[in-house]
Amino acid sequence: PQQVRQIATYVYIEMLKAGYTQVAEFHYLHHQQNGRAYDNPAEMALQVRQAAVDTGIGQTLLPVLYSHSGFGGQSPNAGQARFIHDLDAYVRLQEQLGQNIDALKHNQGVCFHSLRAVTKSQIETALTSLPQAWPVHIHIAEQVKEVDDCVAWSGQRPVQWLANEVGFDARWCLIHATHVNTDEVLTIAKSQAVVGLCPSTEANLGDGIFPITDLIAHGGRLGIGSDSHVCVSVAEELRLLEYGQRLRDQQRNRVYSSAQPS
């Protein structure tokens, strides 16, 4: 736990120096190496929160619900033991973390690792059990394999499945959403969910390129993040975002509007 706090503190200092004033912390390192909970089940999350307090950065803490290793509720593997919660333990964790929070600087949210890591009933119950004002984050459609596996399991693509089976709105942030078709882009735009793009990580992992220009054309919303902290630079993330669209479309000046031409 102390190492996690030290690492988070270092990263938050780097972020503040780079101009970031707020971080949404996608936190799923919950347990000991053997998968057992710490004496205080919220130990790791509290260390990450304390790092935000110590550095002064604003934080939205997003404890991640991670229960399965694949679509359809497949059993987790040994390498995932530190991440795993059942739904009851997850709700208790969220309730504990919600106590004595400094609402001026810190927020909290609901977070699902991915559609392959949770079930429909878990998503629905978590959403009804926790405050409706909290933001909701999920990694979705990041890689082609995820899309293919989702289609094989359900007959639907990930964003399509989420829209049809659960639904999402402006409180949701769909992280990556790299591999979406035209209908899914339109669905996201209409919902006013935010697409959370992480250009440096997506480039580092070779994930692909999200169709930003299509989303903007339909009035959709997007934000940038760093995800794996490959780099901590707003300018670099935005440069990669724009250059990715140029490479995809073989045109210049892609991510702009008449109000912000450059």
Regions found by a protein language model. Name each.
Residues 1-36, 43:
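Metal-associated gating/positioning segment near the N- to mid-region
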Residues 11, 15, 26, 194, ...:
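C-terminal helical cap
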Residues 19, 23, 52, 110, ...:
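Divalent metal-coordination and catalytic microenvironments
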Residues 31-175:
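Metal-coordinating catalytic core of metallo-dependent amide/deamination hydrolases
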Residues 128-135, 167-170, 187-196, 217-222, ...:
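Glycine-enriched alpha-helix->loop->beta-strand junction motifs that scaffold or abut catalytic
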Residues 142-193, 203-215, 228-235:
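Catalytic core of soluble alpha/beta enzymes
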Residues 164-171, 213-262:
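His/Asp/Glu-enriched, well-ordered alpha-helical/loop segment
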